[in-house]
Amino acid sequence: MTKPTIAIVGRANVGKSTIFNRIVGERVSIVEDTPGVTRDRIYSSGEWLTHEFNIIDTGGIELGDEPFQEQIRAQAEIAIEEADVIIFMVNGRDGITNEDDFVAKLLFKSSKPVVLGVNKIDNPEMRADIYEFYSLGFGEPFPISGSHGLGIGDLLDEAAKHFPEQQEEDYDDDVIKFSLIGRPNVGKSSLINAILGEERVIVSPVAGTTRDAIDTVYTFENQEYVMIDTAGMRKKGKVYEATERYSVLRALKAIERSNVVLVVIDAEEGIIEQDKKIAGYAHEAGKAIVIVVNKWDTVEKDSKTMKKFEDKVRENFQFLDYAPIAFVSAKERKRLNTLFPLINMAGENHRKRVQSSTLNEVITDAVAMNPTPTHKGSRLNIFYTTQVAIEPPTFVFFVNDVEMMHFSYQRFLENRIRAAFGFEGTPLHLIARKRN
């Protein structure tokens, strides 16, 4: 099931990022102590009452010296392309400016619902100032104060009225859904075409020519798969040409629907920061992951080339040390037979459950090998461990003091669980809870 998406749009200095941070709260920072994952604050998840949604802060756009109208056009374009609902932000202290009118005209051209938020209404006396904003043509303006957190609930109530109905996907549980993510032109569509052996999507050397995400059902050795293709950036307008950071937006909806994510990188161009950022979203979403090095045919090779490249991948993707690596050439259709065994393994491990009795034996042995940490004369005690979820496998440790379960010791326990049970291809979530 795909969560609805809200985009916050408006001219500069109306408080878009403040409202974004109010809505997402502490959810923005998820894996601060995980090396290699840089957190991009322009896209996050939010919750309001019974609703879960994704939210885009278009204030994060950085187009350098581009004229104002180009920046706003870029913001509106992202919102119109990616969002189910648009929150149009204006500044209640300034009244309607020419720039607000420009944004309004752009949003009128879209068929997306627009909710008008009038920010910086910091006290009840200022509410009289909002009525002029009716003239923008988007119905009732909602007075809000980002700095004081006022009116956000009413704004989200209105936005939620426009969320599309959520439909459960009609694929069987044993079907493996996987997506291919990566920056533009690493060969995602070419990989799907090579696997299927037919031209089911548009393939072009120009980034962004795949029209929409395309689900393709495919059977291989009696296992049914659903492949979700996402093209990274669409070639529509300035922002998609000006910055690659928005390629993550195209990937995120596909990640959400997947069991297994193939992180595709370009052997010829090597690994760049954008690759790590996109992979980080799949990791944070708790999906099973296979790293696919495409265009392997373009690399001059000797007996050590693959090992050297694998070492480079491990160095750059330290947070994906559990993910297997496949080296393929979509163009030459070589080594593609290595993909499905890895997808199957990652998918199976993502759903794997282990017996509590065996798990606790492993943890007991681990503690005997490396005793738990101490603090001010007190030692961390792990009373009991149990697996509480799959996709990804999630383990709860009942302890005497949650604060003493340091990241480094948690990492050690994760490694011992992996050594005992495998779990290659899937992240593991470890949670410490105080025993009552």
UniProtKB/Swiss-Prot annotation:
Stretches assigned to the EngA-type G domain: 4-167, 176-351
Binding site residues for GTP 1: 10-17, 57-61, 119-122
GO molecular function per UniProt: GTP binding; ribosome binding
Sequence positions that bind GTP 2: 182-189, 229-233, 294-297
Entry keywords, A to Z: GTP-binding, Nucleotide-binding, Repeat, Ribosome biogenesis
Residue ranges occupied by any KH-like domain in the UniProt entry: 352-436
Bilayer-crossing regions: none
Highest taxon, organism lineage: Bacteria
InterPro entries to which the protein is assigned, alphabetical: G_ENGA, GTP-bd, GTPase_Der, KH_dom-like, KH_dom-like_a/b, P-loop_NTPase, Small_GTP-bd
GO biological process assignments: ribosome biogenesis
PROSITE patterns: G_ENGA (PS51712)
HAMAP family given in the database record: GTPase_Der
Cited PANTHER family: GTPASE DER
Subunit relationships: Associates with the 50S ribosomal subunit.
Function: GTPase that plays an essential role in the late steps of ribosome biogenesis.
Family designation: Belongs to the TRAFAC class TrmE-Era-EngA-EngB-Septin-like GTPase superfamily. EngA (Der) GTPase family.
Protein name as annotated: GTPase Der
The gene coding this protein: der
